[in-house]
Amino acid sequence: MTIEYTKNYHHLTRIATFCALLYCNTAFSAELVEYDHTFLMGQNASNIDLSRYSEGNPAIPGVYDVSVYVNDQPIINQSITFVAIEGKKNAQACITLKNLLQFHINSPDINNEKAVLLARDETLGNCLNLTEIIPQASVRYDVNDQRLDIDVPQAWVMKNYQNYVDPSLWENGINAAMLSYNLNGYHSETPGRKNESIYAAFNGGMNLGAWRLRASGNYNWMTDSGSNYDFKNRYVQRDIASLRSQLILGESYTTGETFDSVSIRGIRLYSDSRMLPPTLASFAPIIHGVANTNAKVTITQGGYKIYETTVPPGAFVIDDLSPSGYGSDLIVTIEESDGSKRTFSQPFSSVVQMLRPGVGRWDISGGQVLKDDIQDEPNLFQASYYYGLNNYLTGYTGIQITDNNYTAGLLGLGLNTSVGAFSFDVTHSNVRIPDDKTYQGQSYRVSWNKLFEETSTSLNIAAYRYSTQNYLGLNDALTLIDEVKHPEQDLEPKSMRNYSRMKNQVTVSINQPLKFEKKDYGSFYLSGSWSDYWASGQNRSNYSIGYSNSTSWGSYSVSAQRSWNEDGDTDDSVYLSFTIPIEKLLGTEQRTSGFQSIDTQISSDFKGNNQLNVSSSGYSDNARVSYSVNTGYTMNKASKDLSYVGGYASYESPWGTLAGSISANSDNSRQVSLSTDGGFVLHSGGLTFSNDSFSDSDTLAVVQAPGAQGARINYGNSTIDRWGYGVTSALSPYHENRIALDINDLENDVELKSTSAVAVPRQGSVVFADFETVQGQSAIMNITRSDGKNIPFAADIYDEQGNVIGNVGQGGQAFVRGIEQQGNISIKWLEQSKPVSCLAHYQQSPEAEKIAQSIILNGIRCQIQ
């Protein structure tokens, strides 16, 4: 992985201080300027060489964390190396061809022979002179705002590529092996009986180049039933960039978008929308319009502006929208040059099937079905395809074929309208039942999704499915075929006539925020489902309703649920919960140490069974330790009432999360549990543990920062260990990920040359982020010249090996790093364009005063050479 280094602290401090002395403007002009030495104080002020600050920004060679803007549009926060250029007083930004891709600027047609270069860096390669290669281009750097502005003609800017990373920048990562684990031990006892169990789950794998080998398993042991082990999900995987797809060989699951998902052992090849530009990965309509003059086009959604551009006279197309949400129509306003305005509305609602016009999504699977409850596992071929036809229609289709006489085909449409988004599809199945006949049937499905903007009511899903009497889905068909071929003794033989299968199914979900005159009164939800079945005539249903709100003293929620089973029995329940921060009870506005909140839950089933639970939880200042205590009382209609008390604690160690709980009940029963989860990565630098577990599909980063033990990665729980490595799993494939180190918890006296890096990993990769550090004792030196004059501000300080270890600040005070117990330093600067240097000796004292981990060395005398 190519690391993008960040802040050069000493350089930035030097520049900021010097700007204050010179009363610099926020933005530096590119024109030559001459500074008046009378602004500087000191005997030797007139001899200080200020020429390096006469040409634009006073940038010196180094690595700076900058905000990159292209044509005044923010692109990325990234580290840029500034290199020294012959004939230039100030360093210039080293912009490479790779940077142009990152900034979504088309690469100029150049080669090594005719490239116009600022410089050539051994690590970065060619530093391009954009002002020569791209006509009318300019590059400006604002030191105070740490902003790098690149202006190029609009024709050079890639279209529809906001937040997109070119495939040439996707990283395979390093070769590595990894293992994630979750272990849990449980012990319970009641008078006269003990029960114990152990559970362990593992996700492991290995990365070799672009290939990922993965497997998972779990182990169970119980006092009564003994032990068993299950090893599954064994596969190799890689992406295929040219197809924007993923390839899996081995055990995987078919997609559940078109048909019900099943486990297979074979091959799966499917398109991956994460590889597409964000403007193509999600649904949004293409806007067509006509401008009479040079016009400004503004698009709003829900009252918020989401897009604005300027178009020339004539027809225009806007195909790079990134709406803020679904369900609210788009309002398009065309403002002509004379001030006249025209407005029209573009319907915008979406269901999961909707795609942008011209965008396709596909999935192909083939292999042996893996189903635990059948004896004969057939081979399956399944394929599906979705395609955005226009702003209003997305078509999709799919097929399933097995080698035991089952086929199914599907056709469907997704529709975007002003009254919401609809989808409709029909599936036709054909199955041959052994010793019976061939059955054909259909299943019809309709769904609706709508946001009612006036009331903010979200009807997330209202779906209805009807299946004819002879329709069978794949899972039902395989189960029935297997039960007919392998009947169980003493049971009625299975057939299509007595096999229970779904007939109707309805699901509804409504969410309603309650707001009035900009005041929030909480939110309300309602959801329900109902289904019935062929053959058995049974039906099931479930309904729930709830309300939640937050107030100045805390939050609360109430919900109720009712369900009916196949026999018509009802099961009712009601829940009421309160959460009150302890600082509210104490009347303070700051977080208190110890416990942070009190939570209360009350529930009842209206059958004489009621429960009250009260708990309090908290966490340590560094969030590594969390804990809670709880107590409760249960009223049982059919048995004796029960009370309990318990506690829980967890610790985020460098090797994983350790947790334990204990509880005791009034019936003399006891429960104790211990658990841990985490993971580790084996790489060329050794074995590095992570205190976060990760799944087989997670993308990881191994971070190296020698000597930076204790630094948090991405401000989370993962830290750098004593060997200078750490692991984090919070990465998104095919997107720019900023890997940052929080240096507030550093345990050693070490300086990071950079505190963040940028990585663009492929799916499942392990990228390597190398943070350069400077280890060794740091010191604050108070230095004077042997001739009594002041050492010039910003003079460089060198150790005995010729390495720059610091710079002189105001009043001869300097911060240096990497000094020995005793030794010599040399200081160099320019006076009247002539080099001047002095030599000084230092020696550490055990009694020396310290600021943090830096010692203070006074009375350092520098002898003029």
Swiss-Prot record:
Record membrane topology: Multi-pass membrane protein
Pfam families: PapC_C, PapC_N, Usher
Highest taxon listed in the record's lineage: Bacteria
Entry keywords, A to Z: Cell outer membrane, Disulfide bond, Fimbrium biogenesis, Membrane, Signal, Stress response, Transmembrane, Transmembrane beta strand, Transport
Consequence of gene loss (knockout): Deletion of the operon under classical laboratory conditions does not result in any major effect on E.coli capacity to form biofilms compared with the wild-type strain.
InterPro entries: Fimb_usher, Fimbrial_membr_usher_CS, FimD_plug_dom, PapC-like_C, PapC-like_C_sf, PapC_N, PapC_N_sf
SUPFAM superfamilies: FimD N-terminal domain-like
Similarity comment: Belongs to the fimbrial export usher family.
PANTHER family xref list: OUTER MEMBRANE USHER PROTEIN, OUTER MEMBRANE USHER PROTEIN HTRE-RELATED
Record protein name field: Outer membrane usher protein HtrE
